[in-house]
Amino acid sequence: VQWHQIPGKLMHITATPHFLWGVNSNQQIYLCRQPCYDGQWTQISGSLKQVDADDHEVWGVNRNDDIYKRPVDGSGSWVRVSGKLKHVSASGYGYIWGVNSNDQIYKCPKPCNGAWTQVNGRLKQIDGGQSMVYGVNSANAIYRRPVDGSGSWQQISGSLKHITGSGLSEVFGVNSNDQIYRCTKPCSGQWSLIDGRLKQCDATGNTIVGVNSVDNIYRSG
């Protein structure tokens, strides 16, 4: 992977085909049009600790675990969605997924207006893709299941603190040492190490974006 640093500082980032969204350590929200090589971030009103976007909407949660969404191009305004989540994923095909402060798992069919259904299991972080949803638990064990919530959780070998399933053909993740791994979908645990260090990452198409331990921003390609 050829990494390019993007100007700016973010603690969490999400990528879509046309936009990057992120939040900084002060929970301020920023938007940049892809590919964002120049780092021309626009601050968006509001305060969020985590964001995730699909082609149409960006979703996020604030320090009180309140849930918000708005159009991915930054138009309109934040709309509150009922429920409480510490982490939300909008990238899953047909479903919003999230986990709450007790690591309980929820899904909601798009366009979600708060009709959450609890899904069995416990995960601390989750990310949806085209056919599967991927997540990690408090022990950094890795799981996947069909993105519509059918079937059951299947453990994938390996250990990650954060995973992204939104890439086209690969799953990406980072471990407790901020080492970066990739695995060809649907991924049964054949992880290969990527150069670099990231604490959080997200993927769109064949592009991966992420932030490191000092909130520097990077993208592949």
UniProtKB/Swiss-Prot annotation:
Disulfide cross-links: 32-36, 108-112, 183-187
Cited InterPro entries: Beta-propeller_rpt_TECPR, Tectonin_beta-propeller
Sequence repeats: 1-38, 39-75, 76-113, 114-150, 151-188, 189-221
UniProt keyword Signal, yes or no: no
Molecular-function annotations in GO: carbohydrate binding; metal ion binding
Tissue: Hemocytes.
Any one Gene Ontology cellular component term annotated for this protein: transport vesicle
Main location: cytoplasm
Entry's localization field: Cytoplasmic vesicle, Secretory vesicle
Top-rank taxon: Eukaryota
Chain spans, region 6 X approximate tandem repeats: 1-221
Keyword Transcription regulation: no
Swiss-Prot/TrEMBL GO biological process terms: defense response to bacterium
Keywords tagged on the record: Antibiotic, Antimicrobial, Calcium, Cytoplasmic vesicle, Disulfide bond, Lectin, Metal-binding, Repeat, Zinc
SUPFAM superfamilies, alphabetized: Fucose-specific lectin
A Pfam family it matches: Tectonin
Function: Lipopolysaccharide-binding protein with Gram-negative antibacterial activity. Binds zinc and calcium.
Family that this chain belongs to: Belongs to the tectonin family.
Protein name: Lectin L6
Species for this entry: Tachypleus tridentatus
